[in-house]
Amino acid sequence: MKHKLIALLITGACAAVAEATAQPVTKVTFYSPSVVRIVKYPADMKTQPEKHSFTVIMKPEKVKVKTTDTGNATEYETEDMRVKVDKATGTALFLTIKGDTLLREMGEPQFTMRKGDVDEGKYIVEQSWKLDKGEAIFGLGQRKDKDISLRGKDITLWNVNTYTTIPVFTSQKGYGVFWDNMGRSFFTDNDKGTTFKSEVAEMTDYYFVYRDGTTDGVIAGLRALTGRATMFPLWAMGHWQCRERYKTSDELAGVLDKYRELEIPLDGIVQDWQYWGCDSNWNAMRFMNPYYINKVGDPAYERYLPADMRNMKQSEPRLKSPEEMVKYVHSRNSHLMISIWASFGPWTEPYAELKKIGALLPFETWPRNSGTLPYDAFNPKARDIYWKHLSNLYKMGFDAWWTDSSEPDHFEKPGDDDYMTAAGSWRSVKNAFALVHNRGIYEHQRSTKGNSKRSIQMTRSGQLGIQHYGTFSWSGDISSTWDVMQEQVPTGLSYVICGIPFWNTDIGGFFSWSYHNNPKDPGMQELQTRWMQWGAFMPLMRNHCSSPMVSEIYEYGNPGDWAYDVQKAYVKLRYRMLPYIYSTQGDVVLNDGSMMRPLVMDFAADSTALTRNDEYMFGRSMLVKPVTSPLYTWQDNNGYGHLIYPDIRQAAAPVEVYLPAGTAWYDFWTNERIDGGRKLMRPCPITEMPVYVRAGSIMPWGPEVQYSSEKPWDDLEIRVYPGADGKFVLYEDRGDGYEYERGQYTLTEFRWNDATRTLTIGARKGKYPKMLTHRRFNIVMVGKDSGRGDGAMKVTRTVEYNGKEITMKF
């Protein structure tokens, strides 16, 4: 039946309207021309329920909306989209400006009253939509699935270790839906429709995003809503070494020394857990393990010894305090990340302070049987206490935070969902825990007087919005198997397409039980080598493993051994790509770009590309196909690996690669030019992972270095891949600090006109202190005689550049 329009702002430049149906009230709010919020609540509520969004920080803009009464519906039109609301049912239909259907709601939302728990009086809610038959949709975050498609899937949205769900799906049609509910939720796609369902809410609440029909447009809208990405320091784009765990400062320093001795580039090293001591002292955020503070044998500190260190022997330590360790790492031109958790043992000072204000969550977490409890990150006073203790490590000079177990770990039992946080029941807020936890650390660090470091946090969980708070996710404690590696590629793609640009895995996996924790096992060596190759093309490159495994490159062999040489070569390759990688990060921050791009982002019209779960674009130029199956080893029934070929370096088994249509491609290694729209079997020796460069690409390559800031970028190699027009913007700043937020950076645009074979280097835009004002560019017109992609290529022309525009023909 028809009903009256009950809410406001329906003419001219408007933001919100609300309509009442026989059942729910439908409220339409435009946050921008490309982002609209749809809220529905039962008609017996007099007003819209109040709600705090953990994720959305954007306020509605003043949007010009044209409102039209079409008889049975009211239509709202912005410059980017049209939304039509049925007057009888309140169902919404989303269309392009031309009138093409993007998405339609199916019927009214469902509201089922909760009874018998702390959320009694609220609702279980669900909303369904009708998609086109065969329409591809992606997203929902990090989930262990070898298929990036969401069609036909049933997925629970409840964050645990290795499983970080984001309530976002995007379509090949270039729209996205963000279901703004951080409680236990469910996604279902079947013949009846595509549905989100949440266990606790007072209304359905989602955002529809559509700008220009591209996934880039969707991601820009999501970041406008939840926060633009922040810039990580240059060093973070380099190579990180991590292991569970370095048990003394000297052991950590010795690993760094070995990397420098072997000339394996390195920018970051990680101190894992138990520097605080035993489990009862869990996450004290103080160095109380006597091995780190030269207190071995001191009765006052012996109580803090972890069980696995009680019989360790140590000679007089070289580094006698954590302060000395930090200074030493910095003196060797590296940086130090340290593990911190979202829980505290009963012996710690934070535990006592949090208990006093009622800010500990009373459920069982890890480590079990230790009395350790998570803190209530939803309580702002608890976040203050957390930083109060973490700030001591910050003052020591630590560069980055590893916020482990940020789901947090939870050994669930009946009734746990009824625990109340400062923001509501656990079942209603849990999926936002990592977001508020990391946000608290970021905001406290940013507010610290004299802060000159960019905040960088690596978190095991995540949520839409963490990109705004100096945080990236890793995929959790995964196993070292080929099967797991295969699923990690689509796992990462499903995460980043939700709008969070920075992600990585433990290179080599974490638990190496399947190969008996043996880095000399040929099967483990092949797996580690292939994973390291892939790691060179992740947004961040970090080696890791669990004890008793070791992850250092030199543990896999000596110089001259293939497992050592190939890993080192790819680390060196990563460093030569740093100008490309850092500029791509600049595109992420300034233009809402993405570093790791599922093929739908660039080839949405290519149906074959949409189905590829094992390839992606690294930046806008490079197509990457990780090798995720063993080619040269086999594993026996006892878990031991064996070589198939006596000399693995002589083998070249084929790997299938698909090159998307609509462009030509260059084999990165050989420079062979190949037309797109075809599958091919690429010979794949252990030294090579399939990488292709899109025709029209312009890529800056840097010098060989041992750490990211060792040499200035005053002599860059600029590779041009002919075959299409193209451009690239070189982004530069001082490499750390937040001056870039005030415009202190430079942009240098390179443009290639393929028809005229003309390269233009535009006038430099911007400035920052101590920037290069004069430099040399070595132009490489890539072709079959240019040399291998991983080497120094044959220079076609060298130009001197002082910031003024240069044009040259080839």
Language model regions located:
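N-terminal accessory segment at the very beginning of proteins
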Residues: M1, E19-W235, C242-E244, S249-E251, ...
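Bacterial N-terminal signal peptides that target proteins for export
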Residues: M1-A7
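Catalytic-domain carbohydrate-binding cleft regions of carbohydrate-active enzymes
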Residues: G99-E688, R694
